[in-house]
C-alpha cells in the first residue's frame, strides 16, 4: 500500500506508471474497519458560532473585487503574506451559462487577495467532465485574464499528488491523493457556483471539492468517489482538505436539473464565510432547501461547522432579501423547506 506522505508524479498529458497507479488504488480502496467515530476528533475544533456574509451584486459587471474585499474586512479574513489557492467550479465549455463559477468572480477574488497582501495567488481546477483544460479556460473567458495578470493556473487532474490520511471515515477511503500545488498553499479558498445537483441535492462550497482530486487517479467524473457515495465523499474531502474560506458565486445560480442541465436563476449575491457547512446551509435556505434534509449537512455539523441558524451570525444582507423558491427535479422535492 502507498504510504501517506509519498509524492507521486502525474505530469500533464501522461499516465501514472502501472506500479504507482496500483499503489494509489490500493490506498484508495482500502476497506479497513471504521474507527470509533466517523471523524478524527483531534483534527477539529468545532466553532461555537459562525459568520456568513451575503453581499449584494446585481450583475457580473459590479465591482466584485471591492465587494469581496469588503467581505474580507467584515469577516476578518487575513490573507497577508499567504500563498492563496483559489478553486473555482469549471465544468463545461459554454460561456454565458450558469454552469461555471463566473470568470468575473474569480478575477474579483484574485484582485481582493492581492489587495489584502497575499504573497501569491494560484488558481486550480480538476474538471470532471471536460479534459481539455486549455480550451476550457479560453472558452470560459478566464484564460486571457490569468495571462494578463500573470496568475498561474494548475490542472489538478494532472498535478503531482501526495497521499494524505483522511480525517473522517464516511467512505472506505483511508487515504486521499491530493495535488501538491494545493498542499503547498497555506490559504485555500473554494469558489463554487450555487446550483441544484441531481445527486447531492445542491452543490456549493463542500461539493465543489470533488474538483480537487485528480482524474488521473480517481477517473472521470471522479468515479471512484461516486462509487463510494457522493454524500460520504463530500464529507471526507471537506474534513481532510479543510479549506480556509469559501466565496460562492450566487449572482446567477442554477435551478432545476443541475449541475449541468438546469436553468439560470438570478439571485444577486456573493456568499463568503470560513465555515463551509454554515455557508452551504445559508445558501440552501435561500433557495428553499432545508439544510437538515440535505444528507451531508447534518453530519458535517457534528465537527466541521454549524447549520443551525441560532449559531450563525448573518453579515451584510439578510438571507430573506434573496429568498427564492427554486425549481427542483421530482427526486429532490423532499428537500424543500416546509414553509416555502
Predicted regions and their residues:
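N-terminal and secondary-structure boundary signal
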Residues: 2-340
Amino acid at each position: 500500500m502507498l504510504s501517506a506522505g509519498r509524492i507521486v508524479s502525474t505530469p500533464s498529458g501522461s499516465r501514472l506508471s502501472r506500479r504507482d497507479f496500483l499503489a494509489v488504488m490500493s490506498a484508495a480502496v482500502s476497506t479497513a474497519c471504521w474507527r470509533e467515530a466517523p471523524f478524527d476528533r483531534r483534527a477539529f475544533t468545532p466553532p461555537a458560532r459562525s459568520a456568513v456574509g451575503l453581499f449584494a451584486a446585481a450583475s457580473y459587471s459590479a465591482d466584485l473585487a471591492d465587494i469581496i474585499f469588503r467581505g474580507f474586512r467584515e469577516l476578518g479574513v487575513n490573507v497577508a503574506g499567504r500563498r492563496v489557492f483559489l478553486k473555482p467550479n469549471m465544468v463545461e465549455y459554454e460561456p454565458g451559462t450558469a454552469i461555471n463559477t463566473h470568470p468575473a468572480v474569480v478575477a474579483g477574488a484574485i484582485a481582493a487577495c492581492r489587495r489584502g497582501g497575499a504573497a501569491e495567488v494560484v488558481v486550480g481546477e480538476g474538471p470532471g467532465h471536460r479534459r481539455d483544460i486549455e480550451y476550457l479556460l479560453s472558452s470560459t473567458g478566464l484564460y486571457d485574464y490569468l495571462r494578463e495578470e500573470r496568475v498561474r493556473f494548475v490542472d489538478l487532474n494532472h498535478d503531482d499528488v501526495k497521499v494524505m490520511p483522511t480525517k473522517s471515515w464516511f467512505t472506505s477511503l483511508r487515504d486521499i491523493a491530493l495535488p501538491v500545488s494545493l498542499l503547498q498553499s497555506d490559504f485555500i479558498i473554494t469558489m463554487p457556483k450555487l446550483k441544484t445537483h441531481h445527486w447531492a441535492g445542491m452543490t456549493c462550497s463542500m461539493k465543489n471539492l470533488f474538483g480537487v482530486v485528480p482524474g488521473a487517479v480517481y477517473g472521470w467524473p471522479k468515479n471512484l468517489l461516486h462509487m463510494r457515495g457522493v454524500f460520504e465523499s463530500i464529507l471526507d474531502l471537506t474534513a481532510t482538505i479543510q479549506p480556509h474560506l469559501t466565496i460562492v458565486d450566487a449572482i446567477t445560480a442554477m435551478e432545476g436539473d443541475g449541475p449541468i442541465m438546469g436553468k439560470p436563476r438570478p439571485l444577486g449575491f456573493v456568499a463568503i464565510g470560513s465555515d463551509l457547512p454554515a455557508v452551504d446551509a445559508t445558501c440552501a435556505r435561500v433557495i428553499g432547501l432545508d439544510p437538515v434534509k440535505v444528507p451531508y449537512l447534518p453530519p458535517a455539523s457534528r465537527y466541521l461547522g454549524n447549520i443551525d441558524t441560532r449559531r450563525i451570525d448573518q453579515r451584510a444582507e439578510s438571507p430573506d432579501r434573496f429568498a427564492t423558491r427554486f425549481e427542483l427535479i421530482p427526486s429532490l422535492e423532499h428537500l424543500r423547506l416546509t414553509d416555502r
